[in-house]
Amino acid sequence: MKKILFLFTASLLLHVTLQAAKISDVASIVGVRDNHLIGYSLVVGLQKTGDGTTSKFTLQSIANMLKAMNIDMKPIDIKSKNVAAVVVTAELAPFARQGDKINITVSSIGDAKSLEGGTLLMTPLKGVDGKIYALAQGAVSIGGRNGKGAGDSHPTAGLIYDGGLVEREIAIDLYNQDYVTLSLKDANFQNSVSIQKTLNGYYSTEVAVAMDSRTVKLKKPSNKTMIEFLAEVQEINMDYNVQDRIVINERTGTIISGVGIHIKPIIMTHGDITIKITEQENPDKPAGSMVVDENMVIGLNENELYTKEGTTTVANLVRSLQKLGATPKDIISILEAMKSAGSISAELKLI
């Protein structure tokens, strides 16, 4: 059984960083957001890379389209492989006006091999309320070729730049409002209060009230319009508390961590790996050891891992586990178990 032994002395308090940030970077205005749009259509003009005859919905869609053009044909009689059924999606930005252009994403839902060279037929795009907000149409782009872009790796999805035309606006009236609400991107009582204190100090009057860890209510000054007020608010710097965070992509095995995130004492076993983290000052370097970095050494005889002077951090742990041949899946499982046991105080975010 492989053993990993960490010996360290350090403060184990939760590490929180204080930094300056614009309010616009940490909070958004409630009600001012993108809106998802979706539609269904056909991409035509493919070079025999479209849906086959097993995609019955594609054949039915072709028949329906032809019928709308006064051409009567049964789905069973259609043999074309130059057409693909697709889902069409887009984001309608806040304050988008009728006639504005938006980008369109096209994704195959049948067994098409590629959408390269295809043209999306006119597609109504609807919101969650079922109303049509935009129309999409145009040539589909699937990126680069010869392994240099997204085209070769994922040819069944593509983009149409400026391929959508806004037909209906979403009404957002900020100008006539006296109050608006800010929503913090990450809930944090300290940051909510920091916005309140910063704005009230800046305007020398109470214009902001922290309602909870995510919400701050704003009242515009009497000598400004709401638009002028918000334009100023978004550019004001505040003291922003950033808690340490470990980001894990379970699909790719990618782990992103700050270098100073400490690990509290713990003893755990994962498969054939035993991890023991204890407090001990100035441990002796084991005989026959190999240096991992300036803080850690591995005892080659027993596959034990030691720290020298300094602290045991997530970054040290990950590097050391890699030295011992642990897989990304093993490392992710170990970090998740440590977080559950309270050995890691940083936020663990899975994506």
Swiss-Prot record:
Entry keyword annotation includes ATP-binding: no
GO biological process, one term: bacterial-type flagellum-dependent cell motility
InterPro entries in the record: Flag_FlgI (IPR001782)
Entry GO MF terms: structural molecule activity
Cellular localisation: Periplasm; Bacterial flagellum basal body
GO cellular component, one term: bacterial-type flagellum basal body, distal rod, P ring
Cited Pfam families: FlgI
Signal peptide residues on this chain, from the entry's feature table: 1-20
Superkingdom of this protein's organism: Bacteria
Keyword tags: Bacterial flagellum, Periplasm, Signal
Keyword Transferase: no
Entry similarity comment: Belongs to the FlgI family.
Role played: Assembles around the rod to form the L-ring and probably protects the motor/basal body from shearing forces during rotation.
Self-association state and partner proteins as the record states: The basal body constitutes a major portion of the flagellar organelle and consists of four rings (L,P,S, and M) mounted on a central rod.
HAMAP family assigned: FlgI
Protein's name in the database: Flagellar P-ring protein
Organism: Sulfurimonas denitrificans (strain ATCC 33889 / DSM 1251) (Thiomicrospira denitrificans (strain ATCC 33889 / DSM 1251))
